[in-house]
Amino acid sequence: MSHMDAEDAQFQKEVAEVKQWWNDSRWRYTKRTFTAEEIVSKRGNLKITYPSNSQSKKLWNIVEHRFKNKDVSYTYGCLDPVMVTQMAKYLDTVYVSGWQASSTASSTDEPGPDLADYPYTTVPNKVGHLFMAQLFHDRKQREERLTTPKADRAKVANVDYLRPIIADADTGHGGLTAIMKLTKLFIEKGAAGIHIEDQAPGTKKCGHMAGKVLVPISEHINRLVAIRAQADIMGTDLLAVARTDSEAATLITSTIDPRDHYYIQGCTNPALQPLSELMYAAEQSGKSGSELQAIEDAWVKEANLKLFHEAVVDTINAGVHVNKQELINQFLEQSKGKSNAEARTIAQGLTGVDVYFNWDAARTREGYYRYKGGCQCAINRAIAYAPFCDMIWMESKLPDYAQAKEFADGVHAVWPEQKLAYNLSPSFNWKAAMPRDEQETYIQRLAQLGYCWQFITLAGLHQSALMADTFSKAYSKQGMRAYGEIIQEPEAENKVDVLTHQKWSGANYVDNMLKMVSGGVSSTAAMGKGVTEDQFK
């Protein structure tokens, strides 16, 4: 067999393996727009097995089981190795937040708000930081257990430190190649899953900030396809979570996708010139700041911004038609799911009127179109994203059970097996939102709706801040009494392993490695005679 024949044979073998992999039940709801041949041709000759693939399989089994049983895996945003080891005792997944990374772990060391304006290595680096800690503490614990006689081994902790990590990919930090490189980084660093949102990259905001700009549905689907393609090239089961910010979005970059047309607003006042032209003229005349804002506010007020179907309904109601409601119902039924051009034709055919509606006139100074988000809008997007992702998350303004149910019911009406995720955000005022007994059951009530993975994005940040403030305040007044009462004594009472921080950090483990390579004796062992941690025995 010639070299080229062998090369082709190996290629066909790998293609067959990929096709068999894709036939696994793991992918029964996944749509791919590329072939196995295309994926294999993008791989190198050296096959690399990524540890994160084991974590991805583990994560899939968790959410698959939870969804099937109307149960839930819930977690929160982790800050550091200390936190990840403590979370592992009680929670079966770990979340890595872009918000937290932006404020505490940017790879430039420059903190800031959640605008995704940090280098895109930032969140993958945090994932790597935590994953390396997970691997280390797993090794440390295993060594302790295997060097403990069976009769005493039950007394040694047996924590599953290898909890799957789901991380924040923001908007992907650029175009499709940037998204693929970001996905590759996450896989290399140990992520089991990532989520990506449908905001525009240059204007990305925290999900609970104003001024969010969406990309068209088709553009976000391309992002999801890029993530899956990169994971396939690397041979991993990485979970892709599609987040939509459309519930509260007010702008969109383009009208290119007909699926977005229903939710784009236009000017219905034909007497007005386009806003962008008006603003440009005002700037040229020397106006700035509050003067420009006043001009825009006045224009918006006069423009009578509406969705196209609202403009048609108002036109019918203002006309002389005999059966107005029947005409309205006809239009709404016939125009459902149609592009704006098609809806215009239908409206003119039914009413005999060319309804004035100009979405270009309403564009902002930056060129964005006006958009009217909401739960139904988010459902529309989620239905489009579903075949290309593993879970879907709708960012929301409030912890509103009725809205969560509306979203879940809307998605499941089309995709009944679609797994959902939910942000139990600290941006919500939970005390004002619901009484304590409802807070206690909220996670499980959402689980009944199919929200099988839930998370508090910034609980790590807030618990760290609360503890730092509480202890610092007491320490400034009470000295070491504060440390004893607030930290050390509760650590001992609750059997927190970090009480003996030398052991927690792996000092015994490293001592045993030193002894292993030095013939069984080390005069410089860290945990030898004189170590102060003996005081806690």
UniProtKB/Swiss-Prot annotation:
GO terms for molecular function: isocitrate lyase activity; metal ion binding; methylisocitrate lyase activity. Substrate binds at residues 97-99, 207-208, 243, 423-427, 457. Its main location: other. Mg(2+) binds at residue 168. InterPro entries: Isocitrate_lyase, Isocitrate_lyase_ph_CS, Pyrv/PenolPyrv_kinase-like_dom, Pyrv_kinase-like_dom_sf. The keyword Acyltransferase does not apply. Gene3D superfamilies: 1.10.10.850, Phosphoenolpyruvate-binding domains. Disruption phenotype: Leads to limited hyphal growth in plants and extremely low germination rate of pycnidiospores. It is found in: Glyoxysome. The active site is at residue 206. Its EC number is 4.1.3.1, 4.1.3.30. This is Isocitrate lyase. It comes from Leptosphaeria maculans. The gene is ICL1.
